[in-house]
């Protein structure tokens, strides 16, 4: 089958649905690829790069006659008219916001797979295009804020004076919010975050931000991987928190969105008016109405008190090269599910929950949204397990303890009387090493067990040296040789395993 990649026609859209790297992966699945002339130009992908990857370059008319169309945005009426019956379209569709588009797609009798309908389950993460684009949006939001902000993000002490670090508030700790937290923290800002889902607190803190909480308990998870609409009391408390923080912070990044509905209004004009001059608000929900009252989609609004409100709706397109690569990889991973035989043909198997979830039109028939349980469920209240009755243990007779100690003492005295002086010296050191080693190892933090394993390589090396010396003894005692061989084998396992674990540990601290 032939896969066509057209040029995106929307204004300010710089992405493309395939890159030279993803073309190579598609060809390995048995498909042919044709890319429209200059489709990847805005994303820094020349036609020559696609040709070298194995694709063909064609006209718009040739592209839309392909068996499968890979696209970023939903098609226009003219593009739909050019598609042939029975073809497959893979792109963002947004069926709930575009009922008229769905009617036109079903009338064409084609198959439509919506990348915005990927189920939020673990197995579908590799093709979750929404998360890929949200990650880029969160990162780019910080870059845009830094561009408009008139100072450093990180604090500095210079000969000219002290520069305080910027304070950043991120509202919403989803994929975009976490990306914004990471980017702002890496630039040296003091980052705070709020989310209605208490289960994301650890994620926020692990990214280096402070998690803000309100004195009101309400479960924020909706069971579909998104935050649910909260009660009026919760929203009132949250608005009080936003108003308090607005007076302190320099930058606010809002990411709150409700699928298929207008974005919730979180930042009022009064809050913006209370912010310091030069502050910046980045509204990632501008496309669906915005979280801020001052937001205007696609524009930067400067208020009377010199606060800039950024309402761009094309954050992923502002990083077109990376966005195209991630989106193209998502499409390749979807194609692997559609073409498990790698024979260049697709099979929309509804037994696969992922394919069932993304399919919105099949053979001209609109498919209702699938009810798929998400992998990340909100925490359920656990019932306390019944406490088992404790059986009273009888106290140990102290005479038994003293008897054991006396027996050990007698055994040691006997060994001291019959054993050579060298053995007694080594035995004493061995006993002391066991006692000291026990208390040292068991008092080490769990986080340091991996580095501790690396240190044991040296100890195992000493064991191997001792065992090798025993094997070389002229007596030729078979029992001693066997024990020495076992010691070498066990110590070698510890050494090789220790080096392997150490290598993996050190790799965690390398970039790239």
From Swiss-Prot:
Positions of disulphide bridges: none
EC number: 7.1.1.1
Residue ranges, Cytoplasmic side: 1-400, 443-451, 500-512
Membrane topology listed for this record: Multi-pass membrane protein
Subcellular location: Cell inner membrane
Highest classification ranks of the organism: Bacteria, Pseudomonadati, Pseudomonadota, Gammaproteobacteria, Pasteurellales
Spans traversing the lipid bilayer: 401-421, 422-442, 452-472, 479-499
Keywords tagged on the record: Cell inner membrane, Cell membrane, Membrane, NAD, NADP, Nucleotide-binding, Translocase, Transmembrane, Transmembrane helix
Function: The transhydrogenation between NADH and NADP is coupled to respiration and ATP hydrolysis and functions as a proton pump across the membrane.
Family under the similarity heading: Belongs to the AlaDH/PNT family.
GO cellular component: plasma membrane
First-level EC class: translocase
Region (Disordered), start-end ranges: 375-394
Name the UniProt record assigns to this protein: NAD(P) transhydrogenase subunit alpha
SMART domains membership: AlaDh_PNT_C, AlaDh_PNT_N
Origin species: Haemophilus influenzae (strain ATCC 51907 / DSM 11121 / KW20 / Rd)
CDD domains, per database record: Rubrum_tdh
Entry's Gene Ontology BP terms: NADPH regeneration
Molecular function terms from GO: NADP binding; oxidoreductase activity; protein dimerization activity; proton-translocating NAD(P)+ transhydrogenase activity
Family annotation (InterPro entries): Ala_DH/PNT_CS2 (IPR008143), AlaDH/PNT_CS1 (IPR008142), AlaDH/PNT_N (IPR007886), AlaDH/PNT_NAD(H)-bd (IPR007698), NAD(P)-bd_dom_sf (IPR036291), NADP_transhyd_a (IPR026255), NADP_transhyd_a_C (IPR024605)
Annotated residues for binding of NAD(+): 125-128, 175, 195-197, 225
